[in-house]
Structure formats: C-alpha cells, structure tokens
Amino acid sequence: MPSFDIVSKVEMQEVDNAVNQTVKEISQRYDFKGSKCEIKLEKDAIKLLADDDYKLKAVVDILQSKCIKRGISIKSLQYGNVEPASGGMVRQAVDIQQGISKEKGKDIIAVVKESKLKVQAQIQDDQVRVTGKNRDDLQDVIKLLKGKDLGVELQFVNFRD
C-alpha cells in the first residue's frame, strides 16, 4: 500500500548559519553602533537580548530575513514574550519548533478526513503517516495540505509505493 510521512523538521545547521549572519550584520550596521545587542543559539531556542524594544524588533527582522534566505520557514520559529532584563535591556526567547505536536497532528488528520479521500492518517511520535490504496489519492492529500495554513511548516517525505 502506498504511504508517505508528514513531518516538520528544521535543519539546525541552517539555523546556526542564519544566527551567525545576523550577528555579523548587527555588528556592521550603523544603527547598532555602541549597543549591546546579543543573539545566541542554544539547543532548541534562540535567545535575543537588546537595548530596547525598537532594537529588539530590528534584530527579529534581521533574523527573519536571514532565515528566509537560508530556506528556514518562519512558521517554525515560535516567539516568546518580551521580558525586561538587567540594565534596562529587553530579552526574548525564540523556540525552534521540531516535529508535529499532537494537537497539530489531530488537526492534520481532521483535514484529511474532511476531504473524503480514501486514505488513512495516523500519528506516529512527531510525524503523521498517510496510507492509501491509490497513489493519486496520496498526491491529492499532499496538494490539499499544501493549500491549507495549519500554522506549521510541513514536509512530505518517505513516499513509498
């Protein structure tokens, strides 16, 4: 039976490259001269530290543009609340979303079931497997899910006949 997997993965090396490019641009930009803006990549999060809200927003814009250039979807970045830090600075955590959560998996399965296509979808850890008797039905599911905005970046992998 033909099947494929729906996953949401982020290439961490590309995230590291985007963060490094952001650091380089911050160090070279005129409006950041003399500021103490920092951006650090941790295991599954990016920590932003800036002088004020304006500079933090500028750092976020730079980070987003670098992520887009590196092929990283903005949907995979989950922004936390802006918190005050010591010395009048502000900080923000940006979580990098890896995998499909149970709630998003249920949403994907609901969309597939609403389509009335003859396929089955099931959640497996952080991915969703879709199986069906007909390869064309699976391709229709891919087309359907690409047209929907589910709040996560989806990749379709492991297509088997």
Curated annotation (Swiss-Prot):
Q: Which UniProt keywords apply?
A: Nucleotide-binding
The record's disulfide annotation reads none
For this protein, the record's Gene3D superfamilies field holds: 3.30.70.860, YajQ-like, domain 2 (3.30.70.990)
Which GO molecular function annotations are given, in alphabetical order? nucleotide binding
Q: Which InterPro entries does the annotation name?
A: DUF520 (IPR007551), UPF0234-like_C (IPR035571), UPF0234_N (IPR035570), YajQ-like_sf (IPR036183)
Q: Is Nucleotide-binding given among the entry's keywords?
A: yes
Give a GO cellular-component term: cytosol
Describe the function of this protein. Nucleotide-binding protein.
Q: Which family does it belong to?
A: Belongs to the YajQ family.
**PANTHER family, alphabetized:** UPF0234 PROTEIN YAJQ (PTHR30476:SF0)
Q: What is this protein called?
A: Nucleotide-binding protein GSU3204
